[in-house]
Amino acid sequence: VLERCLERTLTRYAGEFVGIQEARALLYKMETHYAELVTEAVRVVSLQKIAEILRRLVSEGVPVRAMRTILEAIVAWGPQESSSARLSDRIRLAMARQISHRHARSDRVLPAWIATRPLEEALRTAQRNSENQPVRSGMPAPLSRALNGWFQQQLEALDSDLQPVVVAASDVRAALQQWLKQHDIDLPVMAWQEIAPEFSLQAIAQIRLPKPIPRRESEATAKL
């Protein structure tokens, strides 16, 4: 039990150990075989931004051993995506095979909890309403409570051998992942496009809101 708790803690905070020095070390190691690729990646995106991207990936449990794939995605999408968050999402798509492999069973099946369209729309509305607000206050209180209730109920009934992923639309994936992390729920969130072709999805539940959220309440954001 102690070993599992330690592993969860290290995984949860792993991103905090990735900075410019660590990014530079990874790039230096890559230069041995991919010097031109490293040079082009650093030309397109600053070292500071590369460090931020790696930090995002590590904090979401994405393996960064596939640095060639990461750098190729940076070269391809870096000129078009000024946001580190959006560029990180592009890199995740390029790493669909690695992400799927990390979370799938040995038979290449991904047990999953699927976000329903009403939930995704509620998350989009929350994102629009919180664009100019602090990140931690972006989730409306009723939506946060409803989500927390659903996840706690499902986790209590979940078979200990089952480790599901959460699947949601790409534009709300990061927000849902951040919310789960803030509430100490250690589940990876994948976008549909991140499921590699050779893997299959096993839907075991749909994430449904228990009842419509009153409009007046939904506008009051929770500082969670």
Regions found by a protein language model. Name each.
Residues V1-L224:
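Membrane-embedded alpha-helical signal segments
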